[in-house]
Amino acid sequence: MTRTIAISVEQLYRPQPGGIATYVRGLATGLAALDDESLDVIGVAARGVPRDGLPLRAVHAHVGVNLLTRLWPTWPLGVPGNADVVHATSMAGPFAGGKSTAVHSVSMHDLLWRDEAATSTKAGIQFHERRLKLIASHDDLRVIVTAPSLVGRLADVGIESGRVHAVRLGVNDPGEVASRASVGEVLAGHGVRGPFTLYVGTREPRKNLERLLEAHRQARSINGELGNLVLVGPSGWGGVATGDATVLGTVPRAVLNGLYRDAAVVAYVPRAEGWGLPPVEALHAGSRVVASITTPSVEDNTEVVRVDPLDVNAITQGLVTALTLGDDDASRSRRQASVADLTWRNVALDHLAAWQ
C-alpha cells in the first residue's frame, strides 16, 4: 500500500535559502535512501520552480513563492489531494491539505527572531510571531524540532510537549574531496600559506565574527600554528567587518570538504543558533572543532571544545586548547565516530516515526 508524503520545497528558491534548504535536500535524500517502494515522496514547489535535482516527484502551485507563502495559512495550494502526510519544512507552510485522515506536521528550527531580535527585521519578527501563533492554535499539527531545548520553550507558548517530536539532522557524505595541493592553490590565490583556522557559514551579526576575529588574533599570538583565519560562505543579513581574515566566499563543495580536512581548527561560535551544521561537517571530516555552547548540534559532543560565545577570552583559550588535541588518525577517527549517526537516512527514519 502506497503512502504519499508531501513536503514543501519552496525554501530552496528563496534569496537566502540557508540551513533550511540544506534540511530540505537532506530529508528528500534520506527518504530516497530508505529505498521503500511503499513511499511516494512529493515536493510541493512554487510556480516555475525546477526540481533542483531532488530525488522526488515535484508538483507546482500556480503562484510564485511569495504569494504561496501568504496563501498557505488558509489554503493548501499545490498540496496533492491524496497525500497521507503533509509536512511543512519551515514555518512558511502548508498547514493543511491531503486526505481527510492526513497527518500534518511542521518543522521549527529555532526561535532566532526572539533570541536575536536586534538583528531581525520588524517584518520578519511579525511574520514569525503570526506563524507561531497559528501553529500553536492547530492542536492536530505535529511540530518537529531539531534542537531538544525547543521542546520546553514551545510549551511556554502553548504548544504541548506531546505534539513536539525531536529529530536528528544529518550531514552529507563527503563525495568529492579536493586534493591537498588543490586546496593549497585556492588558499595561495588569496595569500594564505601554511596552517589556517576555518570558519564556515554566513557572514552576519548573529554569527559573532567580531569576537571570533579578536579571539583568533589573541590565540594566534600564543600559538602561530592557528595560521590565518579563513572565512567561507556567503554574506548574510546585515553586514559585518571581516578585519584581517581572508574571505573566500562560496566555494565548490569539493574545495569545502578539503578545507574542512586541512584546517588546523574549525571555529564556529554564533551567539545563537538553530542547529549548526558546520561543526558536524568538520567532525565528519575528522577535524578539531571549537563551537559555542549555543550550538545545539554539538551540545553533548565531548570531542568538541565548547566555549561561551560572549567571552572573547574563552574563545581564545578554546582555540589554543583545540590545537593541543590529537590530529593523528585515531583522533580523527574518534571525531568522525562521534557524528556517525547523523545521517540523512536516520533523519528520514526520525520523521517517519513522528508521522506514525
Predicted regions and their residues:
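Carbohydrate transferase catalytic cores enriched for Leloir-type hexosyltransferases
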Residues: M1-Q356
